[in-house]
Amino acid sequence: MVGKASYVRFPLLFRPILERLMFDFDATLPLMAVQFLILTVILNALLYKPLGQALDNRDEYIRTNLQQAKERLQQATELANQYEQELAYTRREAQAIIEEARAEAQKIATAEIAAAQQALQAELMKAQAEIDQQKQATLQALEGQVSSLSEQLLAKLLA
């Protein structure tokens, strides 16, 4: 409680306020303020600065890792795009090679078919020539036989 001696120093206007206060305005108040300031300085030096520095270091670490991750993601995206372009180019080249091989095979097949047709045509002409030759030989043989038979028939009819 506030003693009567402390009222003498303060005007009567502050008396109701002072009666409600739980501590005296004496030498302990500045001592408590100094203790609070010393505690604040000690906590700042031992706790808040290292904690703040650790948080700053962690923030810098996260920021650095995030930046590196973004750079790696960008590099990976660029590589993926490059590989996709190379793959598309390779596919176009492969398709062109396939089409070229297909055209070459078609050309070879057409040439072989033409050669086979020519060979077949030559065989056919050769066979036709043989048939014509045999026909001529047969006709000549028959003409010889017809004239011989005609003479025999004429001789039998006249006889």
Swiss-Prot record:
Major localisation: membrane
Keyword annotations for this protein, in alphabetical order, are: ATP synthesis, CF(0), Hydrogen ion transport, Ion transport, Membrane, Thylakoid, Transmembrane, Transmembrane helix, Transport
Does the record bear Transcription in its keywords? no
Q: Kindly list the places in or outside the cell where this protein is found, as annotated in its UniProt entry.
A: Cellular thylakoid membrane
Q: Would the keyword Transport turn up in this protein's UniProt record?
A: yes
Q: Name one Pfam family in it.
A: ATP-synt_B
Residues that span the membrane, as ranges? 27-47
The record's listing under InterPro entries reads:
ATP_synth_b (IPR034679), ATP_synth_b/b'su_bac/chlpt (IPR002146), ATP_synthase_B_chain (IPR050059)
Q: How does it sit in the membrane?
A: Single-pass membrane protein
Select a single GO molecular function from the record's annotations and give it. Answer: proton-transporting ATPase activity, rotational mechanism
Instruction: Provide the Gene Ontology terms for cellular component.
Output: plasma membrane-derived thylakoid membrane; proton-transporting ATP synthase complex
CDD domains on file: ATP-synt_Fo_b
The family this protein is said to belong to = Belongs to the ATPase B chain family.
- Show the NCBIfam families listed in the entry: PRK07353.1 (NF005607)
- Quaternary structure and interacting proteins, as annotated: F-type ATPases have 2 components, F(1) - the catalytic core - and F(0) - the membrane proton channel. F(1) has five subunits: alpha(3), beta(3), gamma(1), delta(1), epsilon(1). F(0) has four main subunits: a(1), b(1), b'(1) and c(10-14). The alpha and beta chains form an alternating ring which encloses part of the gamma chain. F(1) is attached to F(0) by a central stalk formed by the gamma and epsilon chains, while a peripheral stalk is formed by the delta, b and b' chains.
Q: What does this protein do?
A: F(1)F(0) ATP synthase produces ATP from ADP in the presence of a proton or sodium gradient. F-type ATPases consist of two structural domains, F(1) containing the extramembraneous catalytic core and F(0) containing the membrane proton channel, linked together by a central stalk and a peripheral stalk. During catalysis, ATP synthesis in the catalytic domain of F(1) is coupled via a rotary mechanism of the central stalk subunits to proton translocation.
Name-wise, this protein is ATP synthase subunit b'
Name the source organism: Synechococcus sp. (strain PCC 6716)
